[in-house]
């Protein structure tokens, strides 16, 4: 039923737009609800005439909600994600569904679609109404990358795998504060106080770690330390930060999202282009959700040219490994910066690198800040840095006893923070 009604809603929408009417998502949902009621009434009249009992009001409501979920939500995926402990969902075809939980469990979940064809069709409908531009999903566009209405991130592929595959990642702690991350064991009060002061002092911060290490969650928490009236420009492949949803905490936010090319290969807007656009919008801070290509150069330029307090995330296997990763991105960018030039740009732009680690423990998945490194200078083919916090096995990151640069200490002192922390240091 949902497919037929979806086609009817799409036809009504297209006709309305063609006649010059503005059609919102709420308008489409309202129209769909009225169509569903009409269909159910027709079914009830037919069943009664055939001597079959009609649906109860509760069953009617369940059918209406299921149809609306299928058309405007993510269907069964939404029902899985309703469990607050669910972190990841990975489906191989319609019926091989793995669910990963926050406590470390990984279990087979329920079948999500009746067939692989229905799975592809549902994903195609999700892409058609995703973000600010329709995203295709077919043999000519074999990957789909979008954000679900619930805020979870979905990636799907077809035609290049034996069966269509879907991976969904959800940020369970969308509004976590530094204090809440401290209480959950991500770091102790010394790191909490240092990071909060670093944000207030407008140090440029790069968050690093592997997939699912908690980089976006920590980035949101750091941004929670900014003044509510600061103008933030966020730049992402897919909107995950969603700072505008927290209007009391972030009152002046411009959220920018990259756009894929259309079927003619036109209309693409890259992260690098968005960074350049964002710099023209009077930002107080520029935030790049994930640096992974040529956007690294305009981002570093933004950090070194007056947009102090900017932040971004990057995939890396260690805090020191970030420097090699950025150099690789710089040499692949259109500017083709060599290692010496990229190191000089990085050293003039980034103040701190915060590295997050993760590991499976008997009590579940643990995520923690494993290292904080201060960038000191560029020395030809090497970036000089000091590891100022380090986590030993089984412990929180603690001060290493290495002093900060005088310039950094002055900026921190100006916001009321005294270095070094007074607790015991790691030897």
Mark where each language-model region is:
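P-loop (Walker A) phosphate-binding loop of NTP-binding proteins
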Residues: 198, 210-211
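Switch/coupling sub-region of P-loop NTPases
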Residues: 203-205, 221-347, 357
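Hydrophobic positions on the alpha1 helix immediately C-terminal to the Walker A/P-loop
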Residues: 218
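NTP-binding/hydrolysis catalytic cores, primarily Walker-type P-loop NTPases
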Residues: 361-427
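Conserved lysine of the Walker
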Residues: 215
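P-loop NTP-binding catalytic core
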Residues: 99-201
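Active-site phosphate-binding and catalytic loops of NTP-dependent enzymes
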Residues: 72-82, 126-147, 230, 333-340, ...
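N-terminal accessory targeting/assembly segments
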Residues: 1-137
């Amino acid at each position: 039923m949902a497919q037929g009604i979806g086609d009817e809603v799409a036809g009504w929408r297209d006709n309305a737009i063609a006649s010059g009417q503005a059609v919102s998502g709420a308008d489409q949902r309202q129209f769909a609800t009225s169509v569903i009621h009409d269909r159910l009434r027709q079914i009830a009249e037919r069943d009664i005439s055939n001597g079959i009992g009609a649906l109860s009001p509760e069953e009617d409501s369940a059918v209406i909600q299921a149809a609306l979920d299928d058309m405007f939500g993510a269907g069964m995926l939404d029902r899985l994600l309703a469990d607050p402990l669910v972190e990841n969902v990975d489906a191989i075809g319609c019926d091989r569904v793995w669910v990963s939980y926050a406590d470390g469990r990984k279990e087979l979940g329920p079948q999500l679609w009746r067939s692989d064809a229905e799975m592809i069709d549902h994903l195609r409908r999700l892409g058609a109404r995703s973000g600010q531009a329709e995203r295709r999903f077919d043999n000519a566009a074999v990957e789909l990358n979008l954000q679900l209405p619930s805020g979870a991130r979905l990636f799907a592929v077809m035609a290049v795998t034996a069966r269509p595959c879907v991976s969904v990642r959800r940020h369970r702690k969308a509004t976590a504060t530094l204090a809440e991350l401290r209480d959950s064991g991500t770091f102790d009060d010394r790191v909490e106080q240092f990071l909060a002061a670093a944000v207030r002092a407008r140090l440029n911060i790069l968050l690093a770690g592997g997939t699912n290490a908690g980089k976006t969650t920590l980035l949101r928490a750091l941004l929670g330390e900014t003044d509510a009236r600061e103008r933030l420009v966020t730049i992402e492949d897919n909107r995950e930060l969603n700072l505008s949803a927290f209007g009391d905490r972030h009152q002046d936010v411009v959220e920018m999202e990259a756009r894929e090319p259309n079927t003619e290969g036109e209309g693409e807007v890259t992260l690098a282009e968005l960074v350049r656009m964002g710099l023209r919008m009077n930002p107080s801070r520029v935030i790049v959700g994930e640096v992974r290509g040529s956007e690294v150069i305009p981002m570093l330029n933004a950090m070194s040219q007056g947009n102090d307090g900017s932040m971004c995330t990057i995939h890396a296997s260690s805090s020191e490994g970030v420097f090699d990763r950025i150099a690789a991105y710089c040499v692949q960018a259109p500017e083709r910066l060599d290692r010496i030039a990229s190191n000089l740009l990085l050293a003039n732009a980034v103040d701190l690198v915060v590295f997050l680690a993760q590991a499976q423990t008997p009590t579940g998945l643990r995520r923690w800040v494993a290292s904080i490194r201060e960038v000191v200078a560029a020395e030809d083919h090497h970036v000089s840095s000091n590891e100022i916090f380090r986590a030993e096995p089984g412990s929180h990151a603690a001060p290493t006893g290495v002093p900060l640069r005088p310039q950094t200490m002055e900026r921190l002192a100006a916001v009321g923070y005294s270095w070094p922390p007074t607790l015991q240091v790691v030897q």
